[in-house]
Amino acid sequence: MLNFFAAAPKGFEYSLAQELTEFGATEIKESVAGVYFTAPLTLAYRITLWTRLASRIVLVIYKGSCESAEQLYNAAYCIDWPAHFSNRNTFSIDFHGTGGFINNTQFGALKIKDAIVDRFRDDGDERPNVSRTDADFKVDAHFRNGVITIAMNFSGPSLHQRGYRSTTGEAPLKENLAANMLVRSGWQAAPTTLLDPFCGSGTVLIEAALMAADIAPGLQRNRFGFEHWRRHDKAVWQDIVAEAKARASLGVKRCEIKFYGSDIDSRLVALAKRNAENAGVLELIEFKVANALNIEPPAAEGYLITNPPYGERLGNVSELLQLYYQLGDKFKKEFGGWKVAMLCSDIELISSLKLKADKQMKMFNGALECAFNLYTLHANSTRRDTPVLPEGVDIADIAPAFANRIKKNAKQLEKWAQKEGIDSYRIYDADIPEYNVAVDKYLDYVIVQEYMAPATIPEAVTKRRLSDVLLALPAAIGINPNKIIMKTRERQKGTSQYQKLDERKLELITTEYGAKFKLNLTGYLDTGLFLDHRLTRRLVGQKAKGRRVLNLFSYTGSASVHAALGGAKSVTTVDMSNTYIAWAKDNFALNGLQGKQYEFVQADCLQWIRDCNEQFDLIFIDPPTFSNSKRMEDSFDVQRDHVNLLSALVKLLSPTGELVFSNNKRKFKMDIETLTKMNITVKNIDDITLPMDYKRNPHIHNTWLITHA
């Protein structure tokens, strides 16, 4: 009897142990990401050819305690390597695990390599050569908890590589994962009609057809690890392969199970057909191009087993939530009598099916932890009478309080926005505490920003509420799900800075009181336009005529544009970011503003103030609540530093000049007493700078008009 270890993804251990038991292996012991077993050589060959779940099978040659580099070397040296492979063969060592005296896997591999080479030399042979890639004989070593296991890679390249896949589609499913889905769903034990409406490159259906047709999954592989092993019995192996080929030929002819696959992507369906043909099961599977929401049950009962798209694969989160919700509705209405098994990495997506799972399991798709849920759809008992809206959501079913509130807000604000001459505005701002999001409308797009929930609320609850928001939105305000953009932010507590999200750009042009501004809805946490400062910008424009205007911490220069359009004599725009200065220039160009009177300065604003000798008639400053940028010499805290900041700015203000000061610190307290002693007059103007769409959140910012006393 020989000792083996069958490696597999985490979560496969139980299924793999059952499979090995059915093969006739003995001394089966589950471990982490694999199963130990013993078997004679003939059975080991059969297992290697027929296993549908294992990723790799290794023949254990040595296993024992190891507490030093010397012990590791001796353990490897004591193995009779010339009895396992010829010095004419190349070899490689795959070492896993660190700890104790092994700081890195390369060190462990090197020690074993030295021992192997020395053993050949000491036995009077020339040393074999090491090949880092495509070696003839592969040594597999594992070090864990002071125990070293040295083995031979018996199976060769990963066993999930069956040999039938031509190329992969987007986010391919590994073959042994598909096989495990079929096993754990119960389908393999009682094969019946099988449907996969998101078939992709056909992996689930092909693996199922291989099972039903009694085709060995390794039959098309052209390489195995034992081929250069000196104890390999070629005749026995060839007999096992010949038997498998005979069974496959007979199995395809006898198979009466029906398989149906569809995908919305015609290229993937074509690929699935090629893969099925390569696997020898194309005649058993009916493929077609179709939207999963339009499929019909091909039989009165059967299994629907699928791996639909999720965040790591495809699509916008709102679109995916809609898709899952509509799928759940379709299953309830049309698939009574069927069983459904679904793999998904996002618990909120799979929860959006609104189906009660019979069983919930975990599986790993590579490193990605996924939920694998099983459902039984009882005929007629779970059908929903209310039709699904075109957007996929019945408002009465999902977050009704949120849906009704935002629907009401949107209706009221749309008329107001048209009258105001704006097309970007806020339609919801955590009006209902349970739905702790802000929803901003930018032309025909919507951005949903999630505020950080209190620590007392479980994460699962906040995720579910956010999913409900994204599900309810399309029907509530009449927007296409693919035009909903999701962002996450905290309520500003002083440390929030502008944050870049990704390289993709979704740029729009918005209009505000006659001014045009460029928006980037996806590149940054903020879009390029602070909507709550809309009236403040207009105020700057109204006060700008004939004046020298300074805009500090200018961001994308929107207040500068209003000043220029308002007839300012000159406009100086200062920001530390090259990106925002370039953006400000773009905004000026959009509005046809050009000339030497418009100056753009990239600089540390605080240092620029200290160095400036000019006078201005109107200054607008909207500093960050807190900043510790690497480009700044010192940190800045608006509460701590506002007196020094304003006193320095007043020195730049002409005798009749005005300073508009705004910030977003929620509990900001203006030190009026100290400023008054400095002959500075301060007046709060929140009442005229808070837009209607922010009336529900009056603490979004605070704004002050400051002059010489």
UniProtKB/Swiss-Prot annotation:
PROSITE patterns, per database record: THUMP, UPF0020
GO molecular function: 23S rRNA (guanine(2445)-N(2))-methyltransferase activity; RNA binding; rRNA (guanine-N7-)-methyltransferase activity
Pfam family for this entry, one: UPF0020
Main localisation: cytoplasm
UniProt subcellular location: Cytoplasm
EC number(s) reported in the record: 2.1.1.173, 2.1.1.264
Broadest EC class assigned to this enzyme: transferase
Residue stretches making up the THUMP domain: 43-154
The keyword S-adenosyl-L-methionine appears for this protein: yes
Superkingdom of origin: Bacteria
GO CC terms: cytoplasm
The keyword Transmembrane helix appears for this protein: no
Keyword line: Cytoplasm, Methyltransferase, RNA-binding, rRNA processing, S-adenosyl-L-methionine, Transferase
Catalysed reaction equations from the record: guanosine(2445) in 23S rRNA + S-adenosyl-L-methionine = N(2)-methylguanosine(2445) in 23S rRNA + S-adenosyl-L-homocysteine + H(+); guanosine(2069) in 23S rRNA + S-adenosyl-L-methionine = N(2)-methylguanosine(2069) in 23S rRNA + S-adenosyl-L-homocysteine + H(+)
PANTHER family: RIBOSOMAL RNA LARGE SUBUNIT METHYLTRANSFERASE K/L, RIBOSOMAL RNA LARGE SUBUNIT METHYLTRANSFERASE K_L
Function of the molecule: Specifically methylates the guanine in position 2445 (m2G2445) and the guanine in position 2069 (m7G2069) of 23S rRNA.
Family (UniProt): Belongs to the methyltransferase superfamily. RlmKL family.
Protein known as: Ribosomal RNA large subunit methyltransferase K/L
